[in-house]
Amino acid sequence: MSYASLSVKDLTSLVSRSGTGSSSSLKPPGQTRPVKVIPLQHPDTSNEARPPSIPFDDIFSGWTAKIKRMRLVDWIDTLFPCFRWIRTYRWSEYFKLDLMAGITVGIMLVPQAMSYAKLAGLPPIYGLYSSFVPVFVYAIFGSSRQLAIGPVALVSLLVSNALGGIADTNEELHIELAILLALLVGILECIMGLLRLGWLIRFISHSVISGFTSASAIVIGLSQIKYFLGYSIARSSKIVPIVESIIAGADKFQWPPFVMGSLILVILQVMKHVGKAKKELQFLRAAAPLTGIVLGTTIAKVFHPPSISLVGEIPQGLPTFSFPRSFDHAKTLLPTSALITGVAILESVGIAKALAAKNRYELDSNSELFGLGVANILGSLFSAYPATGSFSRSAVNNESEAKTGLSGLITGIIIGCSLLFLTPMFKYIPQCALAAIVISAVSGLVDYDEAIFLWRVDKRDFSLWTITSTITLFFGIEIGVLVGVGFSLAFVIHESANPHIAVLGRLPGTTVYRNIKQYPEAYTYNGIVIVRIDSPIYFANISYIKDRLREYEVAVDKYTNRGLEVDRINFVILEMSPVTHIDSSAVEALKELYQEYKTRDIQLAISNPNKDVHLTIARSGMVELVGKEWFFVRVHDAVQVCLQYVQSSNLEDKHLSFTRRYGGSNNNSSSSNALLKEPLLSVEK
């Protein structure tokens, strides 16, 4: 009788008729060296017929236990993160650094804030308002010590687009809606922080973020060209209407604003790049916006060129308390509020975590999100529009060696002094100077280096970058975000439902088994297929896994090259060490697969499941179904045992050899491999 002609059922029945016999008779002729097998300890499920139900109260047991352990100091640190650095502040070491960093960022923020307010379709003073109260509040409630918050270009463009279809920029309603938007954004950020939902943003690919940001930067830059050209262009978040209006108004082109704007832009770019290239001159990077403002204001005040439009009168004094109005438009603004909240998570939390890692302290992204929310809520009570973390100002703050949130308080003081004493001077600032500051700031957001990197490394991510940036350019920022997020989620779902599965082979001279496609020298054995599943197994991917296993069973010649010739697969070994989780649907599907294998005389073996996976399998009854003797600690143990059966098919007394080795799972079962009872195998210490 050949090995292939013996079914599992026949072998099991032979075991029941074979009797106990002496152990020495179990050693097949010609077998001289025992196989060493490490016994796999199976979990005790005698008192756990089914997984224990989890009481509703236990779901929050971790939180309640943590709350009970919290002391008064812990509560203060949680509610007011600033106390973490206040208690340990080293005045002699930190104050000078924080002072210089705060002044540097403040000097940079004043012109930027006015520029971004113009981008949002608001009077410049509202940029300063958005840089005042939110900065102070964030210094108290924010957990990052280097993040610089305030108006940013991308959020300003989103505000302009959201409000453009509701109210004209000259209307008071436009301002009221921008302030209401800050309140809505703050509420959403607080809710997400309290519910610890910051992890949702992980589903958005970095290539999507880069493509969206790059396209938005191009749109922002083009929208500011009107101040260089001297005539109005279409307000749009799409590139085509902007370009068409630029071409259509070419006959209105004026040289003075173009020359002044271009000159200031060149100066800004040179100072920025020199400051980044040389550490001893990094102050130039922060001073660049102020330099552009001073230069433009001086030219405008001295020469009074009539074709260059100026900012005009700016109210003097600090913002007054007022509650946001126009709540009847709140429902219309909710989608934009959600979008700005997403940008805040991407931009602010991403920067804050990177800076925290660089400065070696822990940062909770949910606490950070809550701090941003409080800053926007309180800011909206003092005429601020949505504020978030800035790439450029945070980088300058960190490069200036800011140590704590005190630098943010000093930045707020600089803004307050500007509101109290400097606003009369701002009326002579040319519009083209503010536009140059915006263009200079967003030019660094066009991430063409990332596109080149993605093309070289990962074509799929490059396609994501290209799709997102193209859709954003031609169909608008909102559509671009939705499409980018949709593609990100589609890729996540595809990867989850189609996990990587590898056929393993043995590396020559070792007991190590690796992917045969990655290691061509690895060899496998005829009649045995070893499959590694590199993901959790659950309802969404179990069907794909079963289909792949069936493919490997059919394509036996493709994956085998050593051992005795057999006409089909007799053993399938599942290497489950990478499997971190398995759900009930997957377990039921594996049980069905085992029964399917059984009808075709194929034995299933499982290697190295982790504790949780092993426990789930045991509770489902699969261990008893397959047999405890077919669960192994190592792939090599499973292969050696399977090889014994394959090799014994050519030895004398085949029936007895097969019978004793294919002992039924219900007979002589123990917590260790049943074959360990035979002298053929020994336990490896």
Curated annotation (Swiss-Prot):
It comes from the Eukaryota. The keyword Magnesium does not apply. GO terms for molecular function: secondary active sulfate transmembrane transporter activity; symporter activity. Residues 15-26 have a biased composition (Low complexity). Its main location: plastid. Expressed both in roots and leaves. Residues 15-53 are annotated as: Disordered. It is found in: Plastid, Chloroplast membrane. The chain crosses the membrane at residues 97-117, 122-142, 147-167, 175-195, 203-223, 255-275, 283-303, 332-352, 369-389, 406-426, 434-454, 473-493. It is a multi-pass membrane protein. Residues 518-642 form the STAS domain. InterPro entries: S04_transporter_CS, SLC26A/SulP_dom, SLC26A/SulP_fam, STAS_dom, STAS_dom_sf. Belongs to the SLC26A/SulP transporter (TC 2.A.53) family. H(+)/sulfate cotransporter that may play a role in the regulation of sulfate assimilation. This is Sulfate transporter 4.1, chloroplastic. It comes from Arabidopsis thaliana. The lineage of its organism: Eukaryota, Viridiplantae, Streptophyta, Embryophyta, Tracheophyta.
